[in-house]
């Protein structure tokens, strides 16, 4: 599955359950740890930690599990492909809550400052940025452990999930802006 061997990566019409579990498990864990980190990091205020932690959790879960299936998934090739299952499994959700879109519009998900790709990345980065000052002001070992875990999850997502599990085998990789940036189109 590399350029050295000349073998192309297998494109999945139905991702294996293990890939879906790894993708969603790491996503949910990232969001939950991020919310917990914000709550713990800002617990010096009786309300700030809970408010900002809850806002982050709502933002991240709504962005990934409601907005994406409503706005991005209908334009994906997995929406139209019979009996398909993408790496997040959200094409199945999308088919139940959204009308079919235009696959030619799929690449637009990465256009503009507040595009869906940027919101997805923001949901991953926000807790890391928010926890940094909290570590200085309100240091604790549990907060440091959460911070390190979030960094590890981010590295795992970009260097293992995207490049080896998700994007490498995705049928949309030839039109997806993310796949192009990661260099997995030719693999």
Where are these regions (language model features)?
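Cys/His-coordinated zinc-binding microdomains
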Residues: 77-80, 87-90, 171-174, 180
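Cytosolic/matrix-facing juxtamembrane and C-terminal tails of multi-pass cellular membrane proteins
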Residues: 164-187
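Short membrane-interface loop/juxtamembrane segments of multi-pass integral membrane proteins
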Residues: 84-115, 183
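Hydrophobic alpha-helical membrane-embedded segments
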Residues: 47-82, 153-162
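Eukaryotic polytopic
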Residues: 121, 129, 150-164, 169
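Cytosolic-side membrane-entry/anchor segment at the start of a transmembrane helix
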Residues: 1-39
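Core segments of transmembrane alpha-helices
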Residues: 28-34, 107-131
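Hydrophobic alpha-helical transmembrane segments
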Residues: 42-58, 135-151
